Amino acid sequence: MELSALTAVSPIDGRYGDKADALRPIFSEFGLLRFRVEVEVRWLQKLASHVGIPEVPALSAAANALLDGIVSNFNESDAARIKQIERTTNHDVKAVEYFLKEKVEVNPELAAVSEFIHFACTSEDINNNSHGLMLKTARDEVIKPYCEKLISELKRLAHEYRDMPLLSRTHGQPATPSTMGKEMANVAYRLERQFKQIMAVEILGKINGAVGNYNAHVSAYPEVDWHQFSEEFVTSLGLNWNPYTTQIEPHDYIAELFDAIARFNTILIDFDRDVWGYISLGHFKQRTVAGEIGSSTMPHKVNPIDFENSEGNLGLANAVFQHLASKLPISRWQRDLTDSTVLRNLGVAVGYSLIAYQATLKGISKLEANAGAMAADLDANWEVLAEPIQTVMRRYGIEKPYEKLKELTRGRRVDAEGMRTFIDTLELPEHVKVELKKLTPANYIGQAQRLVDLLK
C-alpha cells in the first residue's frame, strides 16, 4: 500500500491530515533533516568567522551564498538523498555531513574545508539545536496564532454575552447567578495566563562536544575560547544557550514548554465540557450546516461534535506531552539513547493539539445563545435569592439568618411570590425590604458585567 490519507496509520496524517499541514515542514523527517542541514552549515560558517581557526579562512561572498542556498533551497530531493546515504552509513547525522560534503564539492574554496563540516561535534550538538529550532518555529509560527485566536474568540463571547444572565451550577445544582459573558471571561483569562507562560519558556541549545566539556575542541585549538564561541553560535540561531550539559542538552526546557501547553489544553478541555453541558441544558443552540448528519438513526439530532472532538484530541495530546515531559529530562549518566526515539514524537502531541484547537474554534463559530432558555432556568430557581437575603439579614442583626433561609428553601422550589412573602415577615427597615423585593434571579448577578468590562 502506498502512504496516503487513506492508508496512514496515524489519524494526524490520515483523517485529520489537512488540519496538521502546517506542522509537516517542521516536525516531519524532512523538517528534521532541513534543520540539521541548517545547523551544520551555520557551524561551518561560524568556524570560518574566527581568526583563531586559520585552517578555515573567512569565506568569500560566493561561498557563503552557496551555503545559504543549500539551507534556503533545501527540498524533498535533498532529503531523499540524505536518506539514501543513510542506508549505507546507518547513521542519520553522519548522512547529513556526507550530503553537505557532496553539495560543496562544486566550490573549491568550500571543498578545501569540507572536513570542518561537523568539526568537533557529537551528533547531539546538531540534533539538540535542530529540535530547538523545530520547537521554536512550531511555537512561534503555529501554536501562537491558534492560542491567540482562541483567546480572542473567548473575549468576543465574553463581551457579546456580557448582559446575558445565567443560572450558575455548583456540584451540578442551581447556584448564585452569573452572566454567560463572565463565564467566558473566566476561560479567556485562564488561557491567556498559560499562553504567556508558553511564550516565556526559553528554548535552549548547546554545542560543546561528546560530554559537554569541549574536549575535542580544545585538543585541536586550545587558544580558542570555546565557551564563548559556543554561546555566540547557539544564540545566533535564535536559541538560548545552555552552558552546562552532558552529551545531550538535558531537555528540561522541553518539559517546561510541554507542561505549559498541557495546562493550556486542560483549560480548553474544561471549556469544551462546560459548553457541551450548556448545549445539553439548551443554553446554547448550534447553527446547523447544510448536508450534515448528527445521527445515523435519529434525524433530529445536532450533536456538539466539535467540542467532543476537541476534548478527545486534547486528551491524546496531553497524554503524549506528559510522557515527553516526564521522560526526556532523564538520561543515564552522560547519555543514553532512549530520548532519541521519543524526540521523534514532538510533533505528535502538537499535532493532536492543533486538531483540537481547530475543532473548538469551529464549535464556537456555530454557537448561538438561547436567552429564552437561560431566562426560564433562572425563573424556575428563585431559591437562589436565599443568599442575598440572608446576607442582608446578617447586616441588620437578625438571628440565625442562614438557618431561616435554609428552612425556607432547601430541597424546595420557591417562586417569586413565596420569596417576597418571606421578605415581608422580616424585621428589616422598609426601604431594605423594597430593595430586596427588586431582586430577581436574572438581576442578581453582582459585578459580572463590570468584570467583563475589565477584561483586557
At which residue positions do the language-model features occur?
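Short amphipathic alpha-helical segments with heptad-repeat character
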Residues: K136-K144, E148-I151, K155, A185-A188, ...
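Glycine-rich cofactor/substrate-binding loops
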Residues: M1-R34, A62, I85-T89, G282-F284, ...
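A structural signal for small-residue-enriched, beta-sheet-centric alpha/beta enzyme cores
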Residues: S123, V218-Y221, V234-S236, W241-I248, ...
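Hydrophobic stripe of amphipathic alpha-helices that form coiled-coil interfaces
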Residues: L157, Y161-M164, I198-V201, G205, ...
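Glycine-rich anion/phosphate-binding loop at the beta-strand->alpha-helix junction
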Residues: Q194, N240, T246-R332
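Generic, well-ordered alpha-helical scaffold segments in large soluble proteins
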Residues: W43-L47, F99, K103, A138, ...
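A helix-coil-helix interface module used to build multimeric assemblies
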Residues: E2-H217, Y221-E232, G294, F307-N309, ...
